[in-house]
Amino acid sequence: LNTPIQEGNNLYGVVTDPNGAPVGGIVVSDGFSCVATDANGVYQMPRHADAFHVFYRIPADREIPMSEGRPCFWQRLSKTQERYDFVLMPQQAVETDFKLVCIADPQVQKDTDLARFKEESVPDIRAHVSTLEGPVYGITLGDIIFNERSKDVTNQMMPPIALAMRESEIGLKLFQVMGNHDNCMTPTVTDESSNFDLAGRRNFEYKFGPCDYSFDRGNAHIVAMDDILLTDEKHNPSDYEGGFTDAQVEWLRQDLSLVPKDKLVIFCVHIPLRNATSFNRETVRNLLKEFDNVHI
């Protein structure tokens, strides 16, 4: 690396183009802090103890990277590795216009639900996308599956619904937002975090990546966040509040601090913010109010 790594920064790497040239100004995050790469393409930060991924904000002039038919702009963190590099593919031109298709609450719980989604919803979505001109992207707004107090279907339903949502099936690059029914009641993924709210979403993160992230398309800054706060240490998705932790608010503050105020901001969550003030919802709205044009 052409930039010295400061003491205490145990998460770092370099962002380059396909020719190995450094790319400066790229926002990189561990889900708790946001930093920008320097002129050498280097980022560095102290790794948060609960961090699960390192990821970058996809710039408007770069392609959306895909893996297994899904956007993949992250790397899962290991216990010992400190360096994680990224290669960004240039886009031919920054889009002046694009379409964003929002899909809410598939709530797949059993095989018949999955069959209906594949046989009815997917063809409808593909048909709609075919009528749209220009670039088209998609984002769910949570509750991809339907876990409830008496039935946890994470392992049964999340893999097949993820396959049904691949670009080759659904006809667009589809990002994800987490809903309350996407929380795993009894997490099967080993997680040493003492924060049970984080542990409840780990299986979702294994399949779809970070729950709090952002990306840019055209003149829009699109933010996706998990606004589900589990209140039951048994990870019961029926026991929750809508809102954000202090750590999430700080992540959002840092993310938005690196966005021009005249950019369009599209804020995607599962539970509508409405007029509620508790659990940091008013704080989040106040952060968004700093921008001229916001859609929630």
What are these regions (language model features)?
Residues 22-46:
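Short, acidic Ser/Thr/Gly-rich low-complexity loop/linker segments typical of extracellular
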Residues 97-110, 219-233, 266-268:
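Active-site-proximal beta-strand elements of phosphoester/diester hydrolases
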Residues 60-66, 71-76, 150-253, 259, ...:
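Extended active-site neighborhood of metal-dependent phosphoesterases/phosphodiesterases
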Residues 13, 37-51, 86:
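Glycine-centered loop-to-beta-strand initiation motif
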